[in-house]
């Protein structure tokens, strides 16, 4: 048989792989062995081939065809058939998993010299040229800037899985769109057929077994609508999250062919039944398989190694041995990946919201500009003169946002400025005063200078004291006042943001539950160690065994189990235990075990046990006297019957099963049923539309009484008062529980009173200190004023004294001058 030029021969092509260069020697030996096997000789090549073979005994497979030989056929077997297993294990130059390819396996098995022609692996013929290539493939190729445009899968981009052919086109043009205004496009036709394929594959995955049993359109319609509603709801959710108001919402991953198509629900309502009948006929023609065959992939769990049409086989990867540390690392990575994906989704939604807001803002600006243009034209038509800047958006000043911290900083700066100005004024005043004092001190005596220095020192000390008092007052006021909190967001740089790993809610809840269990377990172990073998615990746990106990005569049965120190003198005669207690109480199971006081198992047939009594053993308390089980059943039974002329009668009878012998009561004593019946009949027979008052209605009173009796019971299901349950839980008497609760309330109230009194004393002491500081400040101010007044009076008296001494001196001088003049005049007279 002639081989084509592009056929791959086993002698050449199989030895040109990447792994053939390393084992050329062994391969040549195998080739020699192959020749020797084909000729039937037993030379050195055969021994080399057999020594290097990789034959290994394998398990017999169900899919492998084995030839059965009889004992008579063993002597007639050919040597080639006996050594055929070694021929398969020749080094082929390909990988181990690819050696089982059908054509290669067939060539290796038939690798004998009896056949004259050479087998080859068939490949499609590519030597011929197609003359109509330019007719179907037009256009010029443009090389892209990058290889990856987006990360969508092939299924997201290829569109529908159904492709129209000529038969579908004729049906669409002649039977669907002929003579109708509402035309169905080819893309919409493919979408409908593809949705039919998906729905049938979901509802009838094994349709190929019985193609005639395909569902009708009405039966398949809910599945079609449900599959479309999932996608439609997802689009609506995205549309709502980004605050968009578009009716036709399209994502980036939608194919181009579906951008202008109508929704699937509309197509199903208008064209679904007609197109489904046509598609159903085509589905039956192909025996329930796909109308357009798809690639055959490897199914999970099935090994189709023989089928040559299975593409993309999986590699068998050896799974690594998992440890707890690897599981923890994987879970942490998955949590981190989940958080990153969530953050990416949130960022994408925020970006979409921002772009949507900017788009709406641009559209609003365009509308405003159009309205301004219309107003401008209207003004011109009405000869109204206006400004030329009507069509321009005037920039508005941004409102300055002042935070709490900025306001506090501004107030502090203003206070500092005021304090600095006051200090500068005080300093200037002091300098002026010092200069005046220096001028005066040059005229004063030493004693006056010392007095002035002492006054200055006292003023400085008083000023220091006042400043200290102000600081104490400010400190007390700041301690009493609450700090001002700032709610302004402070953005930290990326280098200062701590890398904190957020914990999951599940992990926190699990740790909380573990801690609670550990706390309870430790408490139980501690209690068990304290009790040791002296005391035993009697609780109301329904899964504990029930005891038949012999009680001592001198003990009271009402207080013994709840005493603070339990007695150990009780003797357990028998104990009953059931491994399936809920089933036993329901009557499903009758498994019960009986043990004596020594712990030995006894046969329950020896004891005359009442099954009804045993089923209620878990509700029985041997330590409570006069046990009563309060039921929620109504104490009176009613029966409704219809008599002659369709008259309805209600018969009543006391419920003797629920009534107690000790407290036998009936509602007949305090409920007037006759008045209730009269009221009902009067309402039915009369045409009065006025409603009866609720408090005057006997029927409403009866209903309220029934509800009160049903729910307002002071006892629980087992006949124990709710007020006694805390004492029972703490295993103490009710009086002890009342004393404990009262002491607890007393201690709490005493602590609250003590805290309140301490707080009041602190406030009172701070107020007294403030008053004392204010009183001292007032005294210091009064002393300063008195000292200033005394200094002024002294200065005035000194000035008066100096003036009087000067006047005396002048008088003396004038007297002396007058006397001198008189003497001179006398001397002149005497001389004359």
From Swiss-Prot:
Component of the NuA4 histone acetyltransferase complex composed of at least ACT1, ARP4, YAF9, VID21, SWC4, EAF3, EAF5, EAF6, EAF7, EPL1, ESA1, TRA1 and YNG2. The keyword Aminoacyl-tRNA synthetase does not apply. This is Enhancer of polycomb-like protein 1. It is found in: Nucleus. Transmembrane segments: none annotated. It comes from Saccharomyces cerevisiae (strain ATCC 204508 / S288c). Residues 1-56, 422-483, 776-832 are annotated as: Disordered. It holds the Pfam family EPL1.
